[in-house]
């Protein structure tokens, strides 16, 4: 299926930038060593492949998912074959002693890329998953930044999100705080990041869910009032690699997308997706009707859909890659904007936040409100959008 046509574009967004920089990109990658953390997820595997095809000296991939690593290797071997350099994967947790031992015995890396994250807004639905989100998005980044600095790596790259700009949910807030910790480390190691939008058909995404619903003869459900920007998986890998190699210290890369041309509702993508499969959407009134019709309608060329306004916690009404007051470079690259950051952070507040969260964790008795209180200390203007409803309560 042509992902570009589904998201309303005709060409790869970063094609011109890649073509202009690819000679330098190949020279740098082929003479460098890379560690990709979280490298078997959708974005991680995309950037891993972008590195692999440029023949790095060493490429190590760490991911907590053994199954995803197996598929990554199968995918790479089947599509690209082999490289002259050292390519290995490791099914280990970055917070573990095994990861520390790997770094101690690896000989170091020129570039460390961290793609691991809990990315779903729904992960704030309970205090336990929420705490793991903070651990993964903030503290594992803080830990591996320190380790990359100790290894004398040239650059550390980590993924932020458009939701970190004026966050309204705790996932976005966690990434905004991650940026603050990264700025603190930027005094010892060069750091660059990327903020980007939804990656079409990435694992767990709503578009990925469309595929699964069709496979299982289940109805398609989507909000009809939420407009989002989309990148293809390949574009996500390209953006990350370009930021890694060409980003200056504290740069945050983001795609230049036009809200009048590139914002699209999930319900519109659902209609296009179904049309590609030869179906017309049949609009249902409720979940029960949609479930019943999913077993009988498709054979007649119709597919049951439930499109309704979003009413769950943390859904942002609009997307933005930067906020008022951030300094921008819109000239350096053709289809990538850059947020230029100074080393603005309050080290004392970051340490208090870290210690308070770790104390909550050791207490075994924290609440979502406890976490929110600490987040507000670091982001006083955090406009948390709480409705009391979560996506897990809906189809």
Regions found by a protein language model. Name each.
Residues 43:
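Hydrophobic/small residue at the entry helix of a nucleotide-binding pocket
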Residues 9-32:
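A short, basic/flexible loop-to-alpha-helix module at the beginning of a structural domain
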Residues 114, 118-176, 184:
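Conserved Rossmann-fold NAD(P)-dependent oxidoreductase catalytic core, especially the SDR/UDP-sugar
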Residues 40:
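Conserved glycine-rich cofactor-binding loop
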């Amino acid at each position: 299926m042509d992902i570009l046509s589904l998201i309303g574009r005709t060409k790869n967004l970063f094609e011109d930038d890649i073509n202009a920089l690819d000679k330098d990109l190949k020279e740098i990658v082929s003479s460098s060593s890379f560690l990709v953390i979280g490298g078997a997820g959708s974005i991680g595997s995309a950037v891993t492949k972008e590195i692999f095809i440029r023949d790095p000296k060493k490429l190590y991939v760490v991911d907590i998912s053994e199954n995803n690593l197996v598929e990554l290797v199968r995918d790479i071997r089947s599509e690209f074959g082999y490289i002259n350099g050292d390519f290995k994967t490791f099914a280990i947790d970055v917070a573990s002693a095994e990861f520390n031992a790997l770094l101690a015995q690896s000989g170091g890396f020129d570039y460390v890329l961290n793609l691991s994250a809990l990315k779903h807004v729904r992960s704030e639905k309970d205090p336990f998953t929420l705490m793991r989100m903070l651990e993964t998005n903030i503290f594992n980044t803080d830990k591996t930044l320190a380790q990359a600095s100790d290894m004398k790596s040239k650059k550390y790259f980590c993924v932020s999100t458009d939701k970190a700009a004026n966050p309204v949910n705790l996932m976005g807030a966690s990434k905004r705080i991650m940026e603050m910790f990264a700025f603190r480390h930027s005094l010892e190691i060069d750091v660059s990041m990327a903020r980007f939008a939804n990656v079409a058909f990435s694992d767990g995404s709503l578009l990925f869910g469309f595929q699964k619903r069709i496979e299982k003869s289940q109805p398609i459900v989507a909000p009809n009032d939420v407009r989002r920007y989309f990148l293809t998986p390949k574009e996500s890998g390209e953006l990350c690699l370009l930021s890694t190699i060409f980003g200056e210290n504290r740069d945050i890369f983001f795609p230049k997308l036009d809200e009048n041309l590139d914002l699209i509702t999930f319900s519109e993508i659902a209609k296009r997706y179904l049309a590609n499969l030869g179906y017309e959407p049949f609009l249902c009134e409720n979940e029960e009707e949609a479930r019943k019709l999913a077993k009988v309608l498709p054979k007649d060329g119709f597919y049951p859909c439930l499109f309704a306004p979003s009413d769950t916690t943390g859904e942002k009404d609009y997307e933005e890659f930067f906020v008022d007051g951030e300094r921008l470079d819109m000239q350096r690259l053709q289809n990538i904007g850059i947020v230029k950051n100074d080393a603005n952070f309050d080290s004392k507040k970051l340490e208090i936040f870290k210690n308070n969260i770790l104390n909550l964790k050791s207490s075994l008795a924290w609440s979502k409100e406890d976490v929110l209180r600490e987040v507000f200390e670091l982001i006083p203007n955090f406009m948390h959008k709480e409705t009391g409803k979560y996506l897990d309560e809906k189809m």
